Regions:
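Short, small-residue-enriched loops and turns at beta-alpha junctions
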Residues: 11-13, 46, 52-56, 84-86, ...
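Extended, charged catalytic domains and RNA/DNA-binding interfaces, predominantly
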Residues: 68, 76-82, 87, 91-132
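Active-site-adjacent C-terminal substructures of enzyme catalytic domains
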Residues: 113-195
């Protein structure tokens, strides 16, 4: 690994702010893999597809909170669920004014809600297949938007556990090669040692 992004999960806001400040303080001083910036995964997600995120800290989109997260110029990407109130407006503001990338995930959004956020500047679907509604022929939802839009990245946890090999092949055969991102999603709960 040469570059990585420390990632927060849904937590009390003060813990998220503290994590951002800590990364800002040390990101240019480490003699190791380069920290690109921070990825804020939650708290602006949906309870139905929260995954490992604690439900009690899931929040509505809030301008003041996001502005505070951006103060250190350390946050480079944030997840939002596109069904959140005013999500397209927030997406445009975050991407254009704050210059932070918006990814969509942990969501129950329908296709139209997802496309509205992609149209406003969101550029990726996070954990494709996971923590979202599954593809349905009458409601292709967020997954359908990720698969059919060649202007957005599909982030895929390609560990063979989160997503089956045939499902990975379906996605990779339907996305331009430069729009598929393979990621790890390892957290302490995997039981693996550091590294």
């Amino acid at each position: 690994t040469t570059t990585w992004m420390p990632t927060t999960v849904t937590a009390p806001l003060e813990d998220i702010y503290k994590a951002i400040a800590n990364v800002a303080e040390c990101k240019d001083t480490l003699n190791s893999a380069r920290i690109l910036g921070m990825f804020i995964e939650g708290p602006y997600i949906t309870s139905k597809h929260k995954g490992a995120h604690p439900e009690e800290h899931i929040r509505p989109l809030n301008k003041e909170e996001i502005e505070k997260m951006s103060e250190y110029n350390t946050v480079k990407s944030i997840i939002i669920a596109p069904e959140k109130e005013d999500a397209p407006k927030f997406t445009k503001w975050i991407t254009q004014d704050l210059k932070i990338k918006v990814s969509l995930g942990h969501s129950s959004a329908n296709y139209e809600e997802a496309c509205a956020c992609f149209d406003m500047g969101a550029d990726a679907g996070v954990h494709t297949y996971c923590a979202m509604e599954q593809l349905h022929h009458r409601n292709p939802n967020l997954l359908g938007a990720i698969m059919t839009r060649n202007d957005v990245y599909a982030e895929l946890i390609a560990d063979g556990i989160h997503v089956s090999l045939p499902a990975m092949k379906i996605l990779l055969q339907n996305k331009p090669k430069d729009k598929a991102l393979l990621v790890s999603d390892a957290i302490q709960g995997t039981g693996l040692k550091d590294g």
